[in-house]
């Protein structure tokens, strides 16, 4: 699933009005954010389906973000934007609270000494709590069973409210508009279970 490095990606992203460059941004009240957007397959599809909602993809690396940009341009999206940055700086990016956060197939950082880098580590969860609307929700999807259990443990540690959890998203009864990411499409074809948690901080 790795993309070949594109040396022109960063320049193209910075030249596009779809890429936010000045912070904090005056985001809309109904903003939906995906952290670790990758190629943007899920988020651009959602933006196309819901033109009245603002979708923002946060991505650390320019090459996959450029793929997302090309998708958005091809679809003529006016409600989709990109931030090139790190989740650790999330609180500096927005003036207004976020309605929904998606964490999709984040790097599991499997080595024990790297546990603080996992995007469901308690320090990151507290950052999400700071930017999320009081009625907002975080959705977490992963194929990694270890990361799923780690997320549950971390959420309990900070007394977050788990609304729903399942180790088999594609065969559960939870009502959610689930659009596949590239990774999810691949794992679905392999019949790999997808873990899912919906949580809030109220």
Curated annotation (Swiss-Prot):
It comes from Metamycoplasma hominis (strain ATCC 23114 / DSM 25592 / NBRC 14850 / NCTC 10111 / PG21) (Mycoplasma hominis). HAMAP family: tRNA_methyltr_TrmB. GO terms for molecular function: tRNA (guanine(46)-N7)-methyltransferase activity. This is tRNA (guanine-N(7)-)-methyltransferase. NCBIfam families: PRK00121.2-2 (NF001080), tRNA (guanosine(46)-N7)-methyltransferase TrmB (TIGR00091). It comes from the Bacteria. Pathway: tRNA modification; N(7)-methylguanine-tRNA biosynthesis. Its EC number is 2.1.1.33. Substrate binds at residues 111, 143, 181-184. InterPro entries: SAM-dependent_MTases_sf, tRNA_(Gua-N-7)_MeTrfase_Trmb, tRNA_methyltr_TrmB_bact. One of its GO terms (cellular component) is tRNA methyltransferase complex. Catalyzes the formation of N(7)-methylguanine at position 46 (m7G46) in tRNA. The keyword Cytoplasm does not apply. It catalyses: guanosine(46) in tRNA + S-adenosyl-L-methionine = N(7)-methylguanosine(46) in tRNA + S-adenosyl-L-homocysteine. SUPFAM superfamilies: S-adenosyl-L-methionine-dependent methyltransferases (SSF53335). PANTHER family: 3-DEOXY-D-MANNO-OCTULOSONIC-ACID TRANSFERASE/TRNA GUANINE-N 7 - -METHYLTRANSFERASE, PENTACOTRIPEPTIDE-REPEAT REGION OF PRORP DOMAIN-CONTAINING PROTEIN. Gene3D superfamilies: Vaccinia Virus protein VP39. Belongs to the class I-like SAM-binding methyltransferase superfamily. TrmB family. Keywords: Methyltransferase, S-adenosyl-L-methionine, Transferase, tRNA processing. The active site is at 107. S-adenosyl-L-methionine binds at residues 34, 59, 86, 107. The keyword Transport does not apply.
């Amino acid at each position: 699933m790795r993309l070949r490095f594109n040396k022109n990606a960063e320049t193209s992203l910075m030249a596009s009005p779809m890429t936010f460059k000045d912070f904090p941004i005056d985001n809309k009240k109904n903003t939906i954010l995906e952290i670790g957007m990758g190629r943007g397959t899920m988020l651009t599809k959602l933006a196309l389906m819901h033109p009245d909602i603002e979708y923002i993809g946060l991505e650390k690396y320019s090459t996959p973000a450029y793929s997302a940009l090309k998708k958005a341009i091809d679809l003529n999206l006016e409600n989709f934007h990109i931030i090139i940055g790190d989740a650790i700086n999330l609180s500096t990016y927005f003036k207004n609270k976020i309605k929904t956060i998606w964490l999709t197939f984040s790097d599991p950082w499997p080595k024990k000494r790297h546990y603080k880098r996992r995007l469901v580590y308690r320090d990151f969860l507290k950052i999400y709590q700071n930017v999320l609307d009081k009625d907002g929700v975080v959705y977490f999807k992963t194929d990694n069973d270890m990361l799923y259990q780690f997320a549950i443990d971390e959420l309990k540690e900070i007394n977050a409210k788990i609304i729903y959890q399942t180790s088999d998203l594609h065969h559960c009864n939870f009502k959610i508009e689930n659009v596949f990411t590239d990774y999810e499409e691949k794992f679905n074809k392999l019949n790999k279970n997808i873990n899912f948690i919906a949580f809030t901080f109220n």
